[in-house]
Amino acid sequence: MELASTMSVAMALAAAIFVVLCSVVASARGRREKALKLPPGPRGWPVLGSLGALAGALPPHRALAALAARHGPLMHLRLGSYHTVVASSADAARLVLRTHDSALADRPDTAAGEITSYGYLGIVHTPRGAYWRMARRLCATELFSARRVESFQDVRAQEMRALARGLFGCAAGRRAVAVREHVAGATMRNILRMAVGEKWSGCYGSPEGEAFRRSLDEAFAATGAVSNVGEWVPWLGWLDVQGFKRKMKRLHDLHDHFYEKILVDHEERRRLAQASGGEFVATDLVDVLLQLSEESTKLESESEARLPRDGVKALIQDIIAGGTESSAVTIEWAMAELLRHPEAMAKATDELDRVVGSGRWVAERDLPELHYIDAVVKETLRLHPVGPLLVPHYARERTVVAGYDVPAGARVLVNAWAIARDPASWPDAPDAFQPERFLGAAAAVDVRGAHFELLPFGSGRRICPAYDLAMKLVAAGVANLVHGFAWRLPDGVAAEDVSMEEHVGLSTRRKVPLFAVAEPRLPVHLYSATE
């Protein structure tokens, strides 16, 4: 009894000390913040700030949009220990991503970035500096240049045919198929063939390949804007109370095993080619990166960044994870919207019949003439951006934005979801699926970062470098699915019954997978074609 009483007193004393410390910290923080002219926003609680508002029933992007509706398009809130500024309108995004891009284009330290990208050696999480500039240049001139993307056009066409064959096989029984499962398999093979080569593209169906795919799914599900509280409250990060770091390390070890095998295989193939006296020709992005890595070791200037072996792995991981997830998720959302809006499906089908005809599949050369398909893709990206909150930016220095202070060290979030549904930018039914809004003069509204009302790939220095490849994958995917099959919902399921709930991780997938019946509508021999 005496021991229990002593423990109770000790716990009460510890709680009192904690409350006093929080009060002291909050008071000191309040005095410092009075010297700043911060954007309007909610006050928040000690220690956690406004993190609680993002942990409720609403997904973070929707919760932040609701707060911005009360406090304004440029909003300040404290998330844990950090000042956070949120841009929720096209004008606010323009200020963050263009006007003040130089000061706000850095990245904050994150456990996911440090662990899974080999100590910030990729492109997504890497802070600004010589290495990031080198990686960005490689993406623009080597990995995702127009010439490189064009060189893999046949690969993309072959995987579209493989997707059609798989769906054709399911059509015989008139059974509903899980759309994302089929599309994700095709995009995985597509990206693997481009990134790591033909030999490794079949690993999707192997036990090791399946484990790799599951680990990617787990990483995407676990890595969201506020999924790891330790990112926002540093002492909780040190304790790893959610086990987030342990999970990331486990996934990293699995991925590293996979990438190391790929690199060793490529190096051996290159060695054999050189030993036989033949000229080695790069056939995939690993070949390109290994060659660039070797060349970077010969640089004489100490100021120039090198591309280490782990950097090759980190860049390949960014390509595989980003390319697979974003394309598959967007195609599934597009098909869900078309199934919920039969009139839009009919318009897309009519356009394909007119432009392509019934004697062949859609080729990438057809895409510039498929204006309605382009509008469907843009409208899908507007309503369902894969990353509704762009990857967080970081203020490297104190900056004044629209007359408000953004303190050095602040996190800066761009709510692409809120911007894309802002009545100020989209006055005509902003929550409705209307591809027609992107036809005519509005067709000039693009997704490549120049139009701040539509930012699925970001803008400025941190724009996604693979946006052109992503658009080709999604547009060709949607076009071929609609062209090759007449789609309908399963018996007993009405359009209004199709759930549009979101599951938020690093990407925003459908919470309920889309099931639909695909009935072939082209000549039978086309479904057995490989080219």
Swiss-Prot record:
Cellular component GO terms, alphabetical: membrane
Cytoplasm is among the record's keywords: no
Reactions catalysed: (6E,10E)-geranyllinalool + reduced [NADPH--hemoprotein reductase] + O2 = (3E,7E)-4,8,12-trimethyltrideca 1,3,7,11-tetraene + but-3-en-2-one + oxidized [NADPH--hemoprotein reductase] + 2 H2O + H(+); (3S,6E)-nerolidol + reduced [NADPH--hemoprotein reductase] + O2 = (3E)-4,8-dimethylnona-1,3,7-triene + but-3-en-2-one + oxidized [NADPH--hemoprotein reductase] + 2 H2O + H(+)
Regulation: induction: Strongly induced in response to herbivory-mediated wounding.
One Pfam family per UniProt: p450
Binding site for heme: 464
Domain of life: Eukaryota
Enzyme Commission (EC) number: 1.14.14.59, 1.14.14.58
UniProt subcellular location: Membrane
Bilayer-crossing regions: 6-26
Protein name: Dimethylnonatriene synthase
Lineage: Eukaryota, Viridiplantae, Streptophyta, Embryophyta, Tracheophyta
